[in-house]
């Protein structure tokens, strides 16, 4: 099969890296050849695959060597669980330079060194936060990733980020082949969460490709720097990631999304009872200004 390049986006702290690493571990279990490219200065996109605190990054090693041209592929590419190939782009020191530049440098380096020509089935880009700048949007902008998956939850800001990312996809979809593959709901146990994300996906013209329930086994595995697939392969949560992997392998629904307005998003939250219409009357009011509090 032809190599598929996928990027995982989502609100910061939503669980992108954990979801991505468990997903690729499940893909490896299916016999797929996979590479993860971490596009985050924290360099935590591969730690569960490599059982390490953080992988040495391309930007760090380039700084030590002099320039990125002084590096060889074997210097930066490591192999972990399930023969998954791992690369971290890295970034500058906090407060110095553009972290998005590290993503651009890393992807260009991997292409120049023919890293993608090793009979790979999948490349996954695990990307920092929202589409915050041109550097982090590179997998979309430069047509590196054809499939975008957004990790979200039933929380308003996670849904807001998913909608924003969809806007970024639309911006570049007409000039390239980038498409939205679906929303991955990484549950936060909010009310009617699966229904809400399915409704959001429908408004975006896409799908909720899988609902990943919340389970403490994920944290237990992370403490050991392992995926659930490796740590406890018999766990129900491991089967959830296996199901997600199979759905992505079989996914044919790749669309140019139809983002919605903030008003439409709030209306959706009201429809599902997450936000009450009356709440709009208390926006900007302090506790002292609210009658309910004044009477206490």
Swiss-Prot record:
Family note: Belongs to the NifH/BchL/ChlL family.
Pfam families: Fer4_NifH
Disulfide bonds listed in the record: none
Cofactor(s) of this protein: [4Fe-4S] cluster
Subunit structure: Homodimer.
Protein name as annotated: Nitrogenase iron protein
SUPFAM superfamilies cross-referenced by the UniProt entry: P-loop containing nucleoside triphosphate hydrolases (SSF52540)
HAMAP family: NifH (MF_00533)
InterPro entries recorded: NifH/chlL_CS (IPR030655), NifH/frxC (IPR000392), Nitrogenase_Fe_NifH (IPR005977), P-loop_NTPase (IPR027417)
